[in-house]
Design a protein with these regions (language model features):
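Conserved phosphate-coupling serine/threonine residues in phosphotransfer and NTP-handling enzymes
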Residues: 1, 118-120
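Active-site neighborhood of HAD-like aspartate-dependent phosphohydrolases
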Residues: 1-33
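Short, surface-exposed acidic
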Residues: 21-34, 53-76, 136-141
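Short, acidic loop-to-helix structural element flanking the phosphoryl-transfer center
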Residues: 70, 85-116
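Short, basic/glycine-rich phosphate-binding loops at helix/coil junctions
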Residues: 76-85, 143
Length: 230
């Protein structure tokens, strides 16, 4: 939602697969499929390996127990996060059109409470959010809920239900901005209105139930999403 991330994530996964000699490479088309099916990095890898087989890697033979499989996924994800953070530090993260302006408008409204709810690991998410929004803006959010903070990833509604609870705002009075069917399902599952800013990877998904489906945040109106006194 906040920045153009899909290709950066895909390249980071492919680099870590190469470093671990896992014999895996995710094409753009296949990564789109994963993005539209599974939320979170570790669940994506579990889904892929469960479907196509667990790989031999520099850590040893193909893992046969749950413990060894989780150890492999943990190691891959840890290194992938490092690679991704290096890309962010190199200035490769770019905000999606209109999102910074929408954030500024929301932060300027004293009647609104604001939150970021992301499946990304805490380290990677904070790196990106600081790079895109800056520490000053980020500090003004009322709540940050990141991948490490919840036990179940989108499309499970847990992250949004928890946000509603912690903010003290009923779900029906929240407004969620998402970019995928997985995110939409999570928001709707929590009972929240959801506005979609689709990406090149998600534009053809079924967004039935969304309040609006637009190309980017320049086409969203905070006044309509969150009417003053509404």
């Amino acid at each position: 939602v906040i920045f153009l991330s899909e290709e950066m994530h895909r390249r980071a996964y492919n680099q870590v697969f190469e470093e671990f000699e896992a014999g895996v490479e995710w094409s753009e088309e296949y990564y789109d499929e994963l993005m539209n099916t599974v939320g979170g990095g570790k669940p994506k890898m579990r889904h892929h390996f469960g479907r196509y087989g667990w790989p031999v890697s520099t850590l040893g033979p193909a893992p046969e127990t749950d413990e060894l499989r989780e150890a492999l996924v943990d190691a891959l994800q840890e290194r992938k996060t490092e690679i991704f953070r290096e890309s962010v530090a190199a200035g490769r993260a770019e905000a999606r059109p209109g999102i910074v302006e929408l954030v500024d408008e929301a932060l300027a409204r004293p009647d609104l409470r604001t939150a970021v709810c992301s499946a990304a690991t805490k380290e990677a998410a904070l790196e990106v959010l600081n790079a895109i929004l800056g520490p000053g803006r980020l500090a003004r959010f009322d709540l940050l809920l990141l991948g490490d903070d919840v036990s179940r990833k989108k499309p499970d509604p847990l992250i949004y239900s928890l946000a509603s609870e912690r903010l003290g705002v009923p779900p029906e009075r929240c407004a969620v901005v998402e970019d995928s069917k997985i995110g939409l399902e999570a928001a709707l599952g929590a009972g929240m209105p959801c506005y979609i800013t689709y990406t090149g990877s998600t534009r053809d998904q079924d967004f039935t139930g969304a309040q609006a489906v637009v190309a980017d945040a320049t086409q969203l109106s905070l006044a309509l999403m969150c009417p003053a006194g509404g």
